[in-house]
Amino acid sequence: MRVILLGAPGAGKGTQARYITEKFGIPQISTGDMLRAAVKAGTELGLKAKSVMDAGGLVSDDLIINLVKERIAQPDCANGFLFDGFPRTIPQAEALRDAGVTLDHVVEIAVDDEEIVKRLSGRRVHPASGRVYHTEYNPPKVAGKDDVSGEELVQREDDKEETVRHRLSVYHSQTKPLVDFYQKLSAETGTPKYSHIPGVGSVEDITAKTLAALD
């Protein structure tokens, strides 16, 4: 099972990725992890990527695609893989297709922007313990205080409304076109299969729909 999981930040991709990888016995592959592993292993591609990153540059799509091909040739990908956060752009998707990397399924976890803003901007964290609360869905016993220590809770920079809205706008301009790309490819060639899963409701409900789509 070779899967791409798409969805905005806060859509719940991480949770669904965990269930998919467990069910099918496939690794979750993110470009960040892949780059770090290649750099650590000191492979030729890893060293090339390291020199680019050390100079403050962005790793080229060509290099990323070659890293992907190297990674999915490893034994743990024999039964497939799940791409998380890749491809991000149309050129990456086209390069992946042109490199002959076959995909079985593209799954989009779709959640309305306002719901995502509510989900993320309501998060509060107790820095010392890592305990996470939500002002609406999982509030602390005393507003703004950690249940155990009574210490102040904080809102992470990433969870501030303006940051969330900026990340969503980047997602819509850059990654949303991928949804159209794969829908079109699926309609024209029959592969990969494309599924749109509404990411609202209980985790169990969303997981059941996601796994049913992949069966």
Swiss-Prot record:
Q: Which GO terms describe its biological process?
A: AMP salvage
Quote the SUPFAM superfamilies the UniProt record gives: P-loop containing nucleoside triphosphate hydrolases
| PROSITE patterns per record | ADENYLATE_KINASE
| The keyword Signal is annotated on this UniProt entry | no
* Enzyme class (EC, first level): transferase
What Pfam families does this protein's entry cite? ADK, ADK_lid
Q: Which GO terms describe its molecular function?
A: adenylate kinase activity; ATP binding
CC annotations in GO: cytoplasm
The record's principal subcellular location, in a coarse class, is cytoplasm
Keyword Kinase in the entry? The reply is: yes
Please list the residues that bind AMP.
T31, R36, G57, L58, V59, G85, F86, P87, R88, Q92, R156, R167
- Quote the subcellular location field of this record: Cytoplasm
Residues engaged in binding ATP: G10, A11, G12, K13, G14, T15, R123, V132, Y133, G201
Cited NCBIfam families: adk, PRK00279.1-1, PRK00279.1-2, PRK00279.1-3, PRK14527.1
Functionally, this protein is described as follows: Catalyzes the reversible transfer of the terminal phosphate group between ATP and AMP. Plays an important role in cellular energy homeostasis and in adenine nucleotide metabolism.
* Name of the featured protein: Adenylate kinase
What organism is this sequence from?
A: Ectopseudomonas mendocina (strain ymp)
